[in-house]
Amino acid sequence: MLEDSFLISHCVRFDIKGRKYIDTPQKYYFEDLGLRNARLGFRQVEETHLMENLIYNELKMRGYIVDVGVVPTRTKETDGTYNRSLLEVDFVCNRGSERIYVQSAYRLPTEEKKQQETASLLKIDDSFRKVVITEDLVKRHMDDNGVEWVNIYDFLMSSEV
């Protein structure tokens, strides 16, 4: 009902390695952050969620079809067993033949946090662009792993991701 009134929209989960959509819970985003804040009585002002919602809205406005990505991964434990898990990519953006993987990271104060935010992007074995958008004041650049880093303000002011 709320989707029919254009108050919220949803993202479907997409298995990046398996290249198929997954029937798991979808993520929902508000079309208007002001209405979201008013509905919540301005009590839940979580910058991380607001920034992710803002990036989603901007990507949709730029004409992308936006999904949430998941990357299956296996890690070897100290006892020799393997642990399977799913890592999330905030947005898988498609427009024609163009695809971009976007990770929203509000602040990255430590190297450990940077590794945590890029882990899912680095597990993707294709040549499409991988971008981290952060509130930190970073100059747009590409790191040694091929991940682009963009400040949220530069992202919003630029016409490209």
Predicted regions mapped to residue ranges:
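Accessory nucleic acid-recognition modules appended to NTPase machines
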Residues: M1-R99
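Active-site ExK catalytic segment of metal-dependent nucleases
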Residues: D90, N94-T110, E117
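Hydrophobic anchor at the start of a short beta-strand
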Residues: V66, R129-K130
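Short beta-strand/turn micro-motifs composed of small residues
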Residues: T134
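Domain-level recognition of nuclease-like catalytic cores that cleave nucleotide substrates
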Residues: L137-V161
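Short, charged, amphipathic alpha-helix that recurs within catalytic cores of restriction-modification
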Residues: R107, E112-R129
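Short glycine-/acidic-enriched loop or helix-start segments at secondary-structure transitions
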Residues: L40, E112-K113, H141-D143
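Short secondary-structure boundary/capping segments
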Residues: R19-K20, N83, L122, K139-H141
